[in-house]
């Protein structure tokens, strides 16, 4: 999928901001433009409250996006805003939970792009916030054709979309450097400290002693997406393991055999195959979080660092 290509390039150190800018402009020029006769016109009717929409495919199960979105939905001014979520996924416990925080959830997962576009236009949104960007199952084509009076990109894809109809990007000074703003199509809206806030987990919290005390060796760990673990990262981590005597590294990642084989091969080349322990996907959230108790020091990836993993 050409739209997913930009997301995966976020993990590629060779791409510059100019590359992302040109990629976005290419998509803007090549995404489908809907014929005027087939679409509902944008209304100029003024709403009583600011009507704000969120569009996502990731409000499901224990996907990280919901943990970030809840901080907004629990704290918005209900006297000034009416919030509607357009969910590009089937209804589940997460969407049911979010329903209690906002005005309405509309499920558009079974609609074609054009059907979803006209359905959303009926709600006369003042602002639509895309929290997917170029991630999987995105609906970026809707934003190309302008589904709301103002359109914003936030959260899911931390870069320019290249779409001339995308008005703003919500970010912070660490994500969008001041000297790179010229390579963003959107107007950059800086939050003062950080672009996002995790709501935390509703689980029992327990202090646990460092595993070093029992093991007598240091345990490093990373639970990041394996796509972020490139050869430069592996070589960096290998140097750390070699310099810290008898240390171990726990890597937890989904069962993506090809990526896992690639990671194991580089560690083996570096003579560290016995120092790295792999844990496969853990579906239960509490079991996943408990695995952190086996780690003394978390190691981060680069150029695309941990987000949800770092918050955890």
Question: What annotation goes with each model-predicted range?
Answer:
Residues 237, 299:
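Hydrophobic, well-ordered secondary-structure elements that form the walls
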Residues 132, 300-304:
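Short Ser/Thr-rich beta->loop micro-motif in glycosyltransferases that lines
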Residues 227-231:
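A short, basic/aromatic alpha-helical/loop segment that forms part
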Residues 80-82, 238-269, 273-274:
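A conserved nucleotide-sugar
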Residues 142, 240, 312:
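Hydrophobic/aromatic ligand-binding patch that stacks against planar heteroaromatic rings
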Residues 1-217, 225, 235, 265, ...:
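Alpha-helical solenoid repeat scaffolds of the TPR/TPR-like class and their adjacent stem/linker regions
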């Amino acid at each position: 999928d050409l739209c997913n290509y930009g997301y995966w390039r976020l993990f590629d150190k060779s791409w510059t901001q100019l590359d992302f800018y040109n990629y976005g402009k290419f998509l803007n020029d090549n995404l489908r433009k809907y014929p005027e006769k087939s679409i509902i016109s944008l209304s100029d009717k003024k709403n009583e409250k600011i009507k704000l929409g969120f569009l996502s495919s990731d409000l499901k199960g224990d996907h990280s996006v919901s943990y970030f979105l809840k901080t907004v939905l629990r704290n918005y001014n209900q006297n000034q805003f009416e919030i509607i979520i357009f969910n590009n996924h089937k209804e589940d416990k997460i969407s049911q939970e979010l329903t209690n925080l906002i005005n309405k959830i509309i499920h558009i997962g079974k609609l074609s792009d054009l059907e979803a576009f006209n359905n959303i236009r009926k709600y006369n949104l003042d602002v639509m916030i895309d929290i997917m960007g170029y991630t999987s199952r995105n609906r970026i084509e809707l934003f190309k054709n302008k589904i709301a009076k103002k359109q914003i990109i936030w959260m899911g894809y931390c870069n320019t979309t290249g779409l001339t109809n995308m008005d703003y990007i919500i970010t912070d000074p660490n994500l969008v450097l001041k000297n790179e703003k010229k390579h963003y199509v959107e107007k950059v809206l800086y939050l003062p400290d950080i672009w996002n806030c995790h709501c935390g987990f509703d689980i029992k919290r327990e202090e646990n002693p460092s595993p070093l005390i029992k093991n007598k060796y240091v345990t490093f760990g990373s639970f990041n997406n394996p796509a972020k673990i490139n050869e430069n990262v592996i070589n960096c981590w290998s140097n750390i393991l070699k310099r810290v005597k008898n240390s171990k590294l726990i890597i937890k990642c989904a069962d993506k055999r090809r990526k896992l084989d690639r990671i194991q091969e580089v560690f083996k080349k570096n003579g560290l195959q016995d120092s790295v322990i792999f844990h496969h996907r853990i579906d239960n959230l509490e079991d996943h979080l408990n695995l952190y108790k086996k780690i003394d020091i978390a190691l981060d990836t680069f150029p695309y660092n941990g987000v949800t993993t770092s918050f955890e």
